[in-house]
Amino acid sequence: MARITPIAYYRNIGISAHIDAGKTTTTERILFYTGVNHKIGEVHHGAATMDWMAQEQERGITITSAATTCFWSGMAKQFNAHRINIIDTPGHVDFTIEVERSMRILDGVVMIYCAVGGVQPQSETVWRQANKYKVPRIAFVNKMDRMGANYLRVVEQIRTRLSAKPVPIQLAIGAEENFTGVIDLVKMKAIHWNEADQGISFTYGNIPTEMLDLAEKWHQNLVEIAVEASTELMEKYLNSEIISEEEIKASLRQLVLNNDIILVTCGSAFKNKGVQALLDAVIEYLPAPTDVSIVNRMLTVENKQTKIYDNSLSSDKAPFSALAFKIATDPFVGNLTFFRVYSGMVSSGDMVFNSVKEKRERFGRIVQMHANKREEIKEVHAGDIAAAIGLKDVTTGDTLCDPEAPIILEKMDFPEPVISVAVEPKTKADQEKMGFALNRLAQEDPSFHVWIDEESGETIIAGMGELHLEILIDRMRREFNVLANVGKPQVAYRETIRVTVEQEGKFIRQSGGRGQFGHVWLRIEPMEPGGKTYEFLNEIVGGVIPKEYLPAVDKGIQEQLKSGILAGYPIVDVRVAVFDGSYHEVDSSEMAFKLAASIAFKEGFMKAKPILLEPIMQVEVETPEDYMGDVIGDLNRRRGIINGMIDNTTGKTIRVQVPLSEMFGYATDLRSQTQGRASYTMEFLKYHEVPSHVVQTIIEAHQTK
């Protein structure tokens, strides 16, 4: 079966924003105007299509990135039907993993900002993720109908806070309750949408007289930016020739694709204004899959494969390649693997190669997802985003490809968890189900870890924040019927060293009969944080330790890394070289060398100036000025380091770095200090050394445990 929509008419886009910028409402309007939904679902009624998990409907926030497909031919039916695959991503910082994996497979992003709140801390996190994967983006300033809405202030914040180059292609006509429409700065026309039919029809009109000068100024700005990017247009401009709308749009599109500018539009999704023009901008300015070269996405490619795959996005005849970007559990069909096809095509029943795990897999059924509804399809082509049922051993970030042309696509980085809690099943019946449920959830979410503490025998779960863990425990109850008692949150400390040491380790038991003999010399040195957390080097010369015992040496070290030495926390950023030692013809064994390495590492670690590291959070507190003194005093008591303050519409925003261990219970304290008028956001920033007076308390707490 040939493809229905030419690939040039595809747009794979994400919709991204901070909490409450109106992201899900905007997506609902897109689905309404493109004819997917015949009735608009409102978030505050708990009926939004894209928020399909029970917890999302209760809390009114988006947790998982739902995928859906719609078609758009333009506000005035001026385009051929374009297929838009939309991924709606969460705005809460605990779910950054969802944003990260969406960014990896998208071609373009619509960033939504609130016209009142402007650029929020979470917007900056999402922006950094989009920069990392070089995703072209346009902005939509939403909620123009709200009290305090100010479009040009948000444009300025995009410039200052995100260090971007925003270029408005629209101006708002009026604001707050007087917001009536927008000015199209390319056409230089006013657009008004018909409220009687929920904004389906619209009219072009003349720009209001009082706005002509402002519109002319911003139109000129837009033309100059478009002209600077093209020698041909520059000549026309200097010769005072007329530059057509199409030429301006083509030049702006190229600048967006190169990530040089961010085009800005505005509207009010709730009042059905501006979303239709935003869809036109998606088609006119964001990339098709053919605008993104697959070769930039590759990790390990030999020259011959680059030839096969080069610009192969535009061709279904090229070898198949796809990236699995999300695993979800479905109550009816089991595992769903969401994947993005970069080249070629695949049909249900085809055999493909998982090049990361070096295993073959067979595609079972292939489904097109619309939020949580499924439509079964026979095949998918380059540019498609779909889900497969029946892939057994695929995890997030794996590449699926043609067995004859193996390729590995660029992988994703996942953050390490910063907070952990102990969970124990309430009944014996829950015990077995809990293990199954936790494994399923960990499979879906690479930023969620599960393990059993060897000393206490407790099951520990770790994630990106309290809300993250709360929702996972809630899902365990709803989806798997498991009731669990949850302990107090614990900080995920780490241990490391400051200096290099050399240390000998011996394990000798010789008391008649076969003995045990293992003898090693290790060099233990600190590594730069941020890369690999552990490296093992074999520097043995002349066979003083036979090769077959070296994996046991590595294992002995790794067991110590896991259990920690100073205070029982995992050890990171160390490089260990085994450079000397000896063995016994009869008595040496793997067990003896494992124990010798373990002894050497433990003693060496304590001599290498060990330190504890703790997660430091980037916190932003928004507070009315009257409470500034109390809030800052409290943050200082929590070992906070203040980075700066900025004015916002309701008072001040304080930026501060605070250790996670000091932030438990902060929400309640902040509420009581400010009579509920302040709010804060928090995200993981880095690991940093724990001050010596605090280290002692942590070590003592570990020993009593």
UniProtKB/Swiss-Prot annotation:
Amino-acid positions noted as binding GTP in the UniProt annotation, renumbered to this chain: 17-24, 88-92, 142-145
Residue ranges the record marks as coiled coil:
none
- The tr-type G domain sits at 8-290
Q: Which UniProt keywords apply?
A: Cytoplasm, Elongation factor, GTP-binding, Nucleotide-binding, Protein biosynthesis
Coarse class of the protein's main subcellular location: cytoplasm
Q: What does this protein do?
A: Catalyzes the GTP-dependent ribosomal translocation step during translation elongation. During this step, the ribosome changes from the pre-translocational (PRE) to the post-translocational (POST) state as the newly formed A-site-bound peptidyl-tRNA and P-site-bound deacylated tRNA move to the P and E sites, respectively. Catalyzes the coordinated movement of the two tRNA molecules, the mRNA and conformational changes in the ribosome.
Return the similarity comment: Belongs to the TRAFAC class translation factor GTPase superfamily. Classic translation factor GTPase family. EF-G/EF-2 subfamily.
- Its name, as the record gives it, is Elongation factor G
From which organism does this entry originate?
Baumannia cicadellinicola subsp. Homalodisca coagulata
Q: What is the lineage of its organism?
A: Bacteria, Pseudomonadati, Pseudomonadota, Gammaproteobacteria, Candidatus Palibaumannia
